Design a protein with these regions (language model features):
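C-terminal helix-rich "cap/oligomerization" subdomain common to oxidoreductases
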Residues: 1-3, 69-71, 219, 290-334
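Rossmann-fold dehydrogenase core element
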Residues: 108-126, 146-149
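N-terminal Rossmann-like dinucleotide-binding module
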Residues: 1-49
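Hydrophobic residues in well-ordered beta-strands that form the structural core
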Residues: 15, 55, 94-95, 120-122, ...
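Predominantly a Rossmann-like dinucleotide-binding segment in NAD(P)-dependent oxidoreductases
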Residues: 126-205, 325
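Contiguous beta-strand/loop segments that form the cofactor/metal-binding neighborhood of enzyme cores
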Residues: 184-257, 278, 285-298, 332-333
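Beta-loop-alpha module in the N-terminal Rossmann-like domain of NAD(P)-dependent dehydrogenases
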Residues: 49-111
Length: 334
């Protein structure tokens, strides 16, 4: 089996847990090169994480014949342009969430991906973990009855106003950064695409949300609530609640279950705790295994460009409903 050689764009904080660490445990995968705007930073990053080569520019990394896959953890507004550049150079792409700045850009990237025949995966790592599949299985099993409502939350403490996630020119904001997870989980559990009924935001700076809550309605009549924050009185909340006609499913920390999670079903007066085999294995390891299988064997991708379009469509609608601007792609030189 030939080694799948991965090059990473930038020296982002997410790269070690999301790519470098799992690559050490996934057979036939190696992170072989890194490129960053600041070569000194790239060299320090490469030395720290055992990456053999530092490449002078993003363009050079994408053109490198000894790289098969590009990992794209750049700021949100740069995801689309650099994913397209990588695809046009014949590289498979693992792109961090959110996939693009908006739904129109997602559709454009998806068109390039489809014509290329290459693997493109949006890095919703939690979706590849067995805890996510168990959530779906419980809801679809009918144990809690007919689904009526889904609540999802992704709130983290990020009080640093200079963090790039608060930059409108880089397509920042809570709904883009953490809300994309809460929206994705809501859609996953409901198994459908929602209409955004209403949304309200709290603002960090002009046009940029630090907190957002949205109300959804699905075609079946199921309702949904999504709450997300980078800074609010709810410092940390990562959860899903699915309500049915007979009971409810509650899950704590579905996006990082390897660090600890709780899953329970309550029906009538009884409560059942659910444990999931393989839960201690990292979401990122499952994701990288799935990506490698897609490249090598044509295995299905659970978070393909089509799913990214659907998620970005909801994100755009949430911003519209809250009276905030839809994000725009950043210039590649940003």
């Amino acid at each position: 089996m030939a080694t799948l050689r991965i090059g990473t764009l930038g020296a982002a904080r997410i790269t070690p847990p999301a790519l470098i660490k799992p690559a050490r445990s996934v057979e036939g995968v190696e992170v072989v090169a890194v490129a960053a705007r600041d070569r000194a930073r790239a060299e320090k990053f490469a030395s720290k994480h055992g990456i053999r080569r530092v490449v002078d520019s993003y363009e050079a990394l994408i053109a490198d014949p000894d790289v098969d896959v590009i990992y794209n953890p750049l700021p949100n507004g740069l995801h689309g342009a650099w994913t397209v550049a990588a695809l046009e150079a014949g590289k498979h792409v693992l792109c961090e969430k959110p996939f693009t700045a908006n739904a129109d850009e997602a559709r454009a990237v998806a068109g390039v991906a489809e014509s290329s025949g290459l693997v493109v995966m949006e890095a919703f790592h939690y979706r590849y973990h067995p805890v996510a599949q168990r959530m779906i299985d419980v809801v679809r099993s009918g144990e809690i009855g007919e689904l009526t409502h889904v609540e999802s939350a992704m709130c983290i403490p990020l009080p640093l106003p200079k963090d790039i996630r608060y930059r409108l020119d880089l397509a920042g904001g809570a709904t883009m950064d953490t809300g994309c997870y809460a929206i994705h989980m809501n859609r996953m559990v409901a198994g459908a695409e929602p209409e955004v009924v209403s949304a309200k935001a709290r603002i960090a700076k002009p046009g940029v949300d630090r907190w957002m809550q949205a109300q959804f309605r699905y075609p079946s009549g199921v309702t949904g609530t999504m709450t997300t924050a980078l800074w609010s009185s709810t410092l940390l909340k990562v959860s899903v609640r699915a309500v049915g006609t007979l009971g409810e499913l509650r899950v704590f920390n579905p996006t990082g279950p390897q660090m600890g999670y709780r899953m329970s079903v309550r029906v009538g007066g009884s409560k059942r705790r659910i444990t999931v085999d393989g839960a201690k294995k990292a979401t990122y390891a499952y994701q990288l295994e799935a990506f490698a299988a897609a490249v090598r064997d044509g295995a299905p991708v659970l978070t393909p460009p089509a799913d990214a379009i659907a998620n970005m469509t909801v994100i755009d609608a949430v911003y519209r409903a809250a009276g905030l601007p839809i994000r725009e792609p950043s210039m590649r030189g940003t």
